[in-house]
Amino acid sequence: QPLTAAVALKMKRAVRLELSRGEDFMGGMPSPACNVTLKTGATRDGQFCALDATVLMDNGIFASPWGNLLATLLGSTYNIPNARVEYSEINTNKPMGGPYRAPSAPLAAYVLESNVDLMAKDLKLDPLEFRLQNAAETGDEMINGTQWPSVNIKACLERLKAHPLYQESSQEENTGSGFAVGIWRCNVSPAGANCRMLEDGTLQLYLGTSDISGIHTGFAQVVAETLDLPLESIEVLQQDTQSGPIAPVSGGSMVSYSVIPAIREASEEVRERLLKLASDHFEASIDDLELHQGTVRVKGVPTKTVSMANLVKKAQSTRGGEGPVMGSGNCSLPENAPAASVHWVKIRVDPETGEVVPLHYLAIQDVGFALNPMLIEGQIHGGVVQGLG
């Protein structure tokens, strides 16, 4: 990609990078190869007491942080008092491994959940109740010595337990069902945001974050809600690292969580500026004013209404006035916001051809506050399809 950008700058025209399937596997940062040996121990009444894992990871020519993530997820998804993970990275003459869908999380989930199913079977315990008994909770110590922030594995399991598909699922001939827990620590980063309202009532939001998965739509929603503006009047402007506010990389499941508090703070500052301008305009107390669909009005007096655009025009055109209506925000959150999930599937297998057909699929995700449910559903559907292959 950097070479493609360099050629585009040199040629002063659009350049497209097109890879064959083989080239994509060789040079597209594929998921690292991994071998995990896992042993667990539990008491007869179903309490995990030990975990021991050995991990060998081939990350190609460069070192990577994926092993630390893998070790954390293996040793911390369930509350296991005695856990050890030995991790070795093997560097080989291959392309660097990359973050293919939450780096190392699918590997950890596959080996750990397979082991949990085997353990429940050996103990003759219900696999869901076994997981409920042992799932990590908020405040539990992770294998790296830190504590889990808010984590809702048990809530996801309880939702599965109560779901009609799970309760009513019968096993017809050549069918089977199963479920697994998934957990991702997510990340967090310092972030900033700036807002400016123009004379036509447009609100410009200046950010340093690149759009990923439609997050700029969610950012505009936050501003629109704070200022009671129509979504189409919000303009999200992505800036470069030289001129834009500090921002996290667009990855690692952290962008919205890290940036939205800064956006809210910036838009709240614009809100306070507008209320102050309207207070002077009406000679009224700020407490008696409210924002309403692009205007500021006196509560209970519909005739006393002024558009935000007019307030901005007056502020910017009056000598010695308030000047541009702007706001800035910044934040640095103290902890991650882990995302837990439980997925259940029922399949039918053709015994003659080996063809596997999914009959029902249930995805239960702790998404926190669903700022844009449609975008979230799209991400979940995409992950399910990718997981099914």
Where are these regions (language model features)?
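Cofactor-binding beta-sheet edge motifs in enzyme active sites
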Residues: Q1-A155, A162, Q167-G389
